Amino acid sequence: MSWLPKSPKARRRLMLVAAIAPVLAVAAGLTLWGLSDSISFFYTPSQAEAARPAPGRSIQLGGLVAAGSVVKHPDGRVEFTVADQDAEDRVLFQGDLPDLFREGQGVVAIGAFREDGVFEAKRVLAKHDERYMPREVSKALKEQGEWYGDGQRPEHQGDAL
């Protein structure tokens, strides 16, 4: 046992560390495992298309509500399209939309993709004043050249939005 320290005090410390380390590792693992259900990643439609999150996995989908895409059903279901410059995703939501929800505005839908590729939202968040847009949405739109921060979008020829 040449790898053990010769000092009895150092041996006790080593044994204490050897006993505590696995307990701490198990505690950290259980904590991370417990939090895994509450972690929700943010995706724009083009990022979701590239990443293909597993059906049923909770995510946040953010972008602009496409013009002419909102369909309200008599049973309270609402269908709309969340789009960015490169992709769009169909969203289904059961319930009341925020008062400020409208076409052409930033939105974050929290939910999961179904097997058929439709996003089923459990919650929908909309911007709350003229200059506000959720940080994740504005950052993603800036990276794609679609958001300019002043509320004005330049004219795009052939732009589907």
UniProtKB/Swiss-Prot annotation:
Periplasmic side: 35-161
Species, as recorded: Phenylobacterium zucineum (strain HLK1)
Subcellular location: Cell inner membrane
GO MF annotation, one: metal ion binding
Source taxon at top rank: Bacteria
Protein's UniProt name: Cytochrome c-type biogenesis protein CcmE
Similarity annotation: Belongs to the CcmE/CycJ family.
Source lineage: Bacteria, Pseudomonadati, Pseudomonadota, Alphaproteobacteria, Caulobacterales
Gene3D superfamilies: Nucleic acid-binding proteins
Membrane-crossing segments per the record: 14-34
Gene Ontology CC: one annotated term: plasma membrane
Function statement: Heme chaperone required for the biogenesis of c-type cytochromes. Transiently binds heme delivered by CcmC and transfers the heme to apo-cytochromes in a process facilitated by CcmF and CcmH.
Gene behind the chain: ccmE
Mode of membrane association: Single-pass type II membrane protein
InterPro entries linked: CcmE (IPR004329), CcmE-like_sf (IPR036127), NA-bd_OB-fold (IPR012340)
Database matches in PANTHER family: CYTOCHROME C-TYPE BIOGENESIS PROTEIN CCME HOMOLOG, MITOCHONDRIAL (PTHR34128:SF2)
Keyword Secreted set for record: no
Sorted UniProt keywords: Cell inner membrane, Cell membrane, Cytochrome c-type biogenesis, Heme, Iron, Membrane, Metal-binding, Signal-anchor, Transmembrane, Transmembrane helix
Binding positions for heme per the UniProt entry: H128, Y132
Ranges of the Cytoplasmic topological domain: 1-13
A Gene Ontology BP annotation from the UniProt entry: cytochrome complex assembly
